[in-house]
């Protein structure tokens, strides 16, 4: 199978995908209601899509093509409200969060589609353990070489995206000590991690052809990279974020990525090189484990900062691009998160400390999602 052509798209347009938890309203464990939700909303007119995910306890919502923060917030709220109304009809709850706090992976049911059943057969128990919930952001790119440049220059900021969105401190009833434990489930897959260091589309097509020839992959969907090109959309897809607890937070993070992309493609402040990845795994671990208080090493200068400090310096740097895109409110929210060092994982731990109940924490996650 050959790689599909890269469809040039309007630069700095973006789309948001959110994988959602479906819970019962008795003890707030995950419940099997994905197919029922889809049946209820199939005729609803929404500014995007709602699709199944790998298990019946998940569902994915996605916006259409957005250009501004205001549009993203408006569209996400409309889709959320449609889903919440359907969930209320079924007496189930919806919430964000990168992991469910106490679900048991062995109880999950794989959705009956050819691809999901294939993944279940291929990956065994990992497929059910993949009942984790992420935010993906697509960024429009004018041509394929620009997409690869943006992919590799954007990798420098992966710790920012992880720490800002982190909302998965609990797994199977245990505080993991991580801010984003979700990504530990992703790392178990053999084709996860970072994309290969190639900067031209011809080289990428050659790499893809070799991988297809080995029989390891059939399409781009088989790569679980932190950032991957999406040729059919004309985008790169940033995939490291936990699903935030609110659509407003998700929109703010998406617009931070959009604004960074404009800075990187127009100003070209980074000349990507293979050695940039020497600290990549360390930086990613620090963000997952310690969140905004983690250490971030600049791969080109070797300078160490906390991730929150690095975010605040980056916000100053990209301020002119925020003004051009109309994303000032989004970046103000990002700045507030970084200064306060309070992401959703911190909030969840606070709820559990006060209430002494993971069930109550999930209930409050549902309230956050509706707000």
UniProtKB/Swiss-Prot annotation:
Q: Which GO terms describe its molecular function?
A: ATP binding; glutamate-cysteine ligase activity
According to its UniProt record, this protein's enzyme class is ligase
Q: Which UniProt keywords apply?
A: ATP-binding, Ligase, Nucleotide-binding
Q: Which reaction does it catalyse?
A: L-cysteine + L-glutamate + ATP = gamma-L-glutamyl-L-cysteine + ADP + phosphate + H(+)
Q: What InterPro entries does the entry give?
A: GCL_type2/YbdK_subfam, GCS2, Gln_synth/guanido_kin_cat_dom, YbdK
On the tree of life, the source organism's domain of life is Bacteria
Q: What SUPFAM superfamilies does the database record attribute to this sequence?
A: Glutamine synthetase/guanido kinase
Q: Does the keyword Cell inner membrane apply?
A: no
Q: Which GO terms describe its biological process?
A: modified amino acid biosynthetic process
Q: What is its EC number?
A: 6.3.2.2
Role: ATP-dependent carboxylate-amine ligase which exhibits weak glutamate--cysteine ligase activity.
Task: Tell me the protein family, please.
Answer: Belongs to the glutamate--cysteine ligase type 2 family. YbdK subfamily.
State what protein this is by name: Putative glutamate--cysteine ligase 2
Native species: Paraburkholderia phytofirmans (strain DSM 17436 / LMG 22146 / PsJN) (Burkholderia phytofirmans)
Question: Which taxonomic lineage is given here?
Answer: Bacteria, Pseudomonadati, Pseudomonadota, Betaproteobacteria, Burkholderiales
């Amino acid at each position: 199978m050959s790689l599909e052509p890269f469809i040039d798209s309007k630069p700095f347009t973006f789309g948001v995908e959110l994988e959602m938890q479906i819970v019962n309203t008795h003890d707030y464990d995950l419940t099997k209601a994905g197919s029922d939700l889809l049946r209820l909303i199939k005729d609803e007119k929404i500014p995007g899509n709602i699709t199944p995910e790998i298990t019946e306890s998940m569902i994915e919502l996605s916006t259409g093509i957005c250009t501004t923060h205001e549009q993203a917030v408006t569209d996400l709220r409309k889709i959320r409200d449609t889903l919440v109304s359907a969930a209320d009809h079924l007496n189930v709850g919806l919430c964000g969060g990168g992991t469910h706090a106490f679900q048991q992976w062995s109880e999950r049911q794989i959705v009956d589609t050819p691809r999901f059943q294939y993944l279940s057969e291929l990956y065994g128990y990992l497929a059910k353990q993949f009942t984790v919930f992420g935010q993906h952001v697509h960024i429009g790119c004018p041509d394929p070489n620009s997409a690869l440049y943006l992919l590799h220059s954007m990798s420098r900021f992966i710790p920012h995206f992880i720490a800002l969105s982190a909302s998965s401190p609990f797994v199977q009833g245990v505080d993991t000590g991580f801010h984003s434990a979700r990504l530990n489930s992703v790392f178990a897959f053999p084709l996860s991690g970072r994309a290969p260091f190639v900067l031209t589309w011809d080289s990428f097509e050659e790499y893809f052809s070799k991988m297809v020839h080995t029989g390891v992959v059939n399409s781009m969907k088989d790569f679980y990279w932190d950032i991957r090109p999406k040729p059919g959309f004309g985008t790169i897809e940033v995939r490291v974020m936990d699903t935030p607890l609110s659509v407003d937070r998700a929109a703010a993070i998406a617009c931070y990525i959009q604004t960074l992309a404009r800075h990187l493609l127009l100003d070209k402040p980074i000349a990507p090189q293979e050695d940039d990845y020497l600290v990549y795994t360390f930086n990613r671990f620090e963000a997952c484990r310690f969140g905004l208080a983690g250490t971030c090493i600049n791969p080109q200068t070797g300078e160490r900062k906390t991730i929150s400090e690095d975010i605040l310096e980056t916000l100053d740097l990209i301020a002119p691009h925020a003004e051009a895109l109309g994303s000032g409110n989004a970046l103000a929210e990002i700045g507030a998160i970084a200064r306060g060092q309070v992401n959703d994982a911190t909030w969840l731990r606070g709820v559990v400390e006060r209430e002494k109940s993971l069930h109550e924490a999930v209930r409050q996650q549902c309230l956050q999602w509706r707000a």
